[in-house]
Amino acid sequence: MKVMQQTTHRTYPIRVAQVIGKAVISGVDSVVMNYYRHIDRSRIQFDFFMDGYNKTLIDEEILDLGGRIIKLEPYEASMRINMRQCRAAFTEGQYTIVHSHLNTLSCFPLYAALQAKVPIRIAHSHSTTSRGEWKRNLMKQALRPFSKTFATHYAACADYTARWLFGSKTIQKGQVRLIKNAVDTTLFSPNEKARERIRKEFGLENRFIVGHIGRFAFQKNHELLVRVFAEVYRQNPNAALILIGTGELETDIRSLVKELDIEKVVFFTGIRRDIPDFLNAFDVFFLPSRYEGMPVVGIEAQAVGLPCLMSDTVTKDTAITPLVEFFPLHASIPEWTQKLLSYEHARKRPYPELVRDSGFDIHHAAEDLCRWYESLFASLQKI
C-alpha cells in the first residue's frame, strides 16, 4: 500500500508509523487506538503497521480517521519478509518517526527503520515476562539487550515495564518517556442503564457477575480463573462468569469449563465493542494474570467504579484508586475462592478525580503525546 510521503520540513500532519503487531482489540492496540481517537489529527496522524492480512475490527475506524493501514507478513511466518516489508514501507513513506510497541521484538522493525533512514525510532515497553512461559522467555531474554540498540528514544507505560526492558540506569537518566495507558473518562463512567441492558441480554439480572476481559493466552491465566470460579459457583449458585476476548487457548478453556460442569453459568462473548457497558454490568473484575505491564482494562474498570481483584504480579502502578486489591498469584484455589466470594456485595464507587489526577485521562494524555511527537520532529530541524 502506498504511504503518504513526508520530509523533515515542518508539514502537518506529522505522520507517525505505529507498529502494533497483531490487532486483537485489547492491550497494546487498544491503548494506541485510545490515543488515536483523541489526539489532534490536524497535527499528528497515525499509520498502522499490523501483522496479518485479514481485516480487523479497527480497520474501518482507522481509515475514517484519516490513518493508513499497512498489512505485514506475520513475523511468526517469516521475520525476513516482515522486515523487508517494513523497510520498504518506511522508505516509501519517508517517515520521520516510527513508534514500535512490540516490546523486545521492537528491535526488528526498528532495525528496518534504521535501514530506511528513519531518524526517530521509538521502542515502547508495554509488558514484562513470566517464569512459567519459558520458551518465550528465552527469546525475550535473548532479544532484550538489543531493545535499545536500534532505538533513538524509549517509552513505557509504567516504571516497572521501563525497568524490565531498558534498565534502571536508563530511567535514572530520565531517558524513558512515560506514556500512560489513559482512558476516556467520559466513556468509562458509571451507567446504570448499561448495567441493566447487559444483564438482561445474558439473563443475569440478579446474579453475582465475575467479569474478565483479555486474550485467551498463557499470560492471562484463564485456567486458574475458571477453576477458582468453579469453586465460587459451588459455594454460591447465584454466581456467573463472563469472559470477553479471543485467543489461541480459547478452545482449551471451553473444554475446561465443560469438564468442570459450569457451562450454564460461563459466557464466552468473543470480541465486544461495548466494553464500558460490560464493566458496568460486572460486580468484580478478576485479573489473575501471571504477569502484566499496565493493563488498560484495569484503568477502565476503576474509571467506572468497579472493584478489581488482581494477582500480585500485576504492576502496583495499576492501583490508582482504592478499588484495586492484589492477591498472591500462588495462593491456593480455596484461598482465591474465599477472596472472590467476598466481592459479591462489594460497594461500587467511582473515583473520576483520582483517574484524572493520576494522569490517566486520555484528553490530557493525548495532548502530551502530541506535543512530544512535535518536539521530536522539531529537533530534527536543529541538526
Language-model features and meaning:
Residues 2-14, 18-82, 175, 248-250, ...:
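N-terminal strand-loop element at the rim of the active site
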Residues 29-34, 208, 212-231, 248-254:
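A conserved mid-protein helix/loop that constitutes part of the nucleotide-sugar donor-binding site
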Residues 49-50, 307-311, 316:
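Short hydrophobic beta-strand element within catalytic cores of glycosyltransferases
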Residues 100-106, 125:
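Short His-centered aromatic/hydrophobic patch
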Residues 150-189:
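A short, active-site helix/loop in glycosyltransferases that binds the activated sugar's phosphate group
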Residues 254-270:
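Nucleotide-activated donor-binding/catalytic signature segment of Leloir-type glycosyltransferases, i.e.
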Residues 271, 290:
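Aromatic "clamp/platform" in nucleotide-sugar-dependent glycosyltransferases that forms part
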